[in-house]
Regions:
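Catalytic strand-loop segment that frames the active site of acyl-thioester-processing enzymes
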Residues: 2-64, 81
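An amphipathic alpha-helix/helix-turn recognition signal
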Residues: 66-68, 142
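A generic structural signal for short beta-strands and their flanking turns/coil linkers
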Residues: 19, 23-25, 33, 43, ...
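Predominant activation on well-ordered alpha-helical scaffold segments within soluble catalytic domains
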Residues: 35-38, 70-74
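HotDog/MaoC-like acyl-thioester-processing domains
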Residues: 1-15, 102-153
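Hydrophobic beta-strand-centered segment that forms part of the acyl-chain substrate-binding groove
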Residues: 55-64, 71-112
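Generic structural detector for well-ordered beta-strands
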Residues: 22, 26-28, 98, 104, ...
């Protein structure tokens, strides 16, 4: 498993702004994961859940939902960054989310990230991390997004 970069202070986080945090392990996106996401969200569009119809469609197969790809950030994040010495961390939001390329069923994905901002907030710190999710063999990212987290001491 990928080993995260461990930060033990706000000063360490601030000093790392702009640095690339490495790569996660590869994750295969299979039809079961796509179907479960469709069930959880109610998005059963045929390009995601109907392999027969999708085979004749624009992608030649089913593809993962863009939001499924985005939802992998909580899985990928801990493989890249860990903040120690805090009582809790919470998701605060996302910025600049885009899905430049589709994720065909069976694709293997991994993420890389860099810290783009660290700001003091009441009781803690806000950290912005720019994620890029790529598909093995792909020429464009499948998801780019800024994830905003807050850590409270």
């Amino acid at each position: 498993m990928a080993e995260p970069r461990i930060f033990t202070s706000v000063d360490e986080l601030k000093a790392a702004v702009g640095e690339q945090l490495g790569y996660t392990d590869w994750l295969e996106v299979d039809q079961k994961r796509i179907d479960l996401f469709a069930d959880a969200t109610g998005d059963h569009q045929w390009i995601h859940v109907d392999p027969e119809k999708a085979a004749a469609g624009p992608f030649g197969t089913t593809i993962a939902h863009g939001y499924l790809t985005l939802s992998l950030l909580p899985l990928f994040g801990p493989q890249l960054i860990a903040v120690e010495g805090v009582k809790m961390g919470v998701n605060y939001g996302t910025n600049k989310v885009r899905f430049p390329s589709p994720v065909p069923v069976g694709s293997r994905l991994r993420a890389t990230a860099r810290i783009t901002g660290v700001e003091d907030v009441p009781g803690g710190v806000q950290v912005t991390v720019a994620f890029t999710v790529e598909r093995e063999g792909g020429d464009k990212p499948v998801c780019v997004a800024e994830s905003v987290s807050r850590y409270y001491g």
